[in-house]
Structure formats: C-alpha cells, structure tokens
Amino acid sequence: SGTAAAYGEAEVKGFELAVSEINAKGGINGKKVKLESMDDKGDATEASNAYNKLVGDNNVLAVAGPTISATTAAVAPLADQSKLVTIAPAATSDSIETGNYLFRTCFKDSYQGEVAARFAAENLKVKKVAVLYGTGDPYSSGVGEAFAKAAEKLGLEVVDKESSSSADDTEYSAQLQKIQASGAELLYAPYYYSVAGPYIIPQARSVGFDGYVMGPDGYDGLKLTGDKAQYNKTYYTTHYSADDNTNSKVQDFIKSYKSKNNAEP
C-alpha cells in the first residue's frame, strides 16, 4: 500500500506466479518454495520493522524488496548487518549504498536524469526547462537534481526550480504558476504516478502550462489514474517494457500473468 502501491501489488503477483511455476516443477533441490509477503506501506519505519521480522525468521533465505528508494534506504544497512540477501527491484536513488547483501535490478537516478535531459534536448528540441521535486524524498530530489545538472551540461536553460516539502502533497498550484511564468517549454516533475496523475499534471494544465511534462520511472502507472487525455505531451523514462520484448520466455510470462491475474503485468 502507500504512494507506490501498484508496484508492490504487481510484484507480489509476479512472485506468486514464479513460486507456483517453480513448485509445479518440484521446487528447488526438491524443496517447495514458500512466499511470505509483508506490506511496508511505502514508509521507512514500516519497512525496517517488516524487514527485522523477516530477519528473525530462520526459514527466510532471501528478501525481494523493498521496492522504492525511501524504504530501501532504511533497510540497506540492515541487509549487511543480518547477512540476508536482499534485492531491491526499483530503488533508483544514488544515495543508497549497495553492499555484499543488498542488490538492485534497476538503473540509478543519475542515469535516468541524464537520459531524460538528453531526450528533452535532442528529441523534443526544447531550450528552456523547469524542475519541480519533493525535497523530503531521496528519489524525487535525487532524480530532479540529476536532470537539472544534465540539462545544463547539454546547454538547456533551467529557468526555474521549484520544490514541495514532500513527494506526496496534493497541492502544487503555487509552484506551477511560477513555472508557467518562467517560460519553460518542459516541466520535469519526478514524483510517483499517484501524485503526478491526479495532482501535478492537471494542476499544471489548469494554470495554463501547455508544454511538455516529463518524469522518471515513477510515472509508470499513470494509466491507472486521471483522464488519459491530460497525458498528451507527457513522457517518462522507465527500465523496461515487456510488451516490446519478443523473447519467448518474456511473452510466456505475460501470457501466464494475464491468465492468472486478469491484468497487464
């Protein structure tokens, strides 16, 4: 649950599918795999508490998660202390220290910030950009700063940088009015889909901003929120699109996931 609930829900469904397929083939070394899911609610304290419970269970051999940067940052030191293999699927913040027991299967914010800036300059051909990010979240602030730094290196003018006190506020009109007045052709707003979709993008349009809106992988999920028409001229970077992958194993996974969950993976 929490700000990025859709990610956790999809991951659990994917894990459940994998476990069922592994066990149907006899398990691992003849032993059945058991999946135990715990909800960190997108909160650092909840994540630490849940992780410590798993550490205390001698039957737990590895942990997949937490998902997002804020919760993974809280768990990172615990992984090495407990020597429990932990894999974070989407913790992109550069501030997270991976060690001997914590790994991630995603790119870092410095990378996606650079890619987004390059796309803005080379594909969208804009000259002036603005950034809006949440100062209280390592993901939002990290990728926001990475984009701004990369944009300046590419010769783009960062005409305005605005911030919110957290990455899950619901009112951004004051900041967006300043961005609209700045002459920005593109707004880079690194928040999660659950904030960008219902709040930031429609509020940007309401104050008269009709330029491009761009975000990071946290925008993956926009189709779950808001009026899809408002996403015209909206772009985001993401790790991977299963739909575009022709590998037979990937397509088999998509088919099995849809069949089991009646939903897109």
Where do the protein language model's features map onto the residues?
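Extracytoplasmic "Venus flytrap"
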Residues: 1-16, 38-45, 67-68, 132-142, ...
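Extracytoplasmic/secreted envelope proteins and their assembly/folding machinery
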Residues: 12-19, 48-52, 64, 72-80, ...
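General small-molecule cofactor/ligand-binding pocket signal
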Residues: 34-38, 159, 235
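Periplasmic-binding protein-like
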Residues: 54-67, 87-89, 128-133, 183-194, ...
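Extracellular/periplasmic periplasmic-binding protein-like sensory domains
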Residues: 201-265
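Beta-alpha junction/loop-to-helix N-cap segments that form part of ligand/metal-binding clefts
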Residues: 7-13, 25-95, 164-172, 194-195
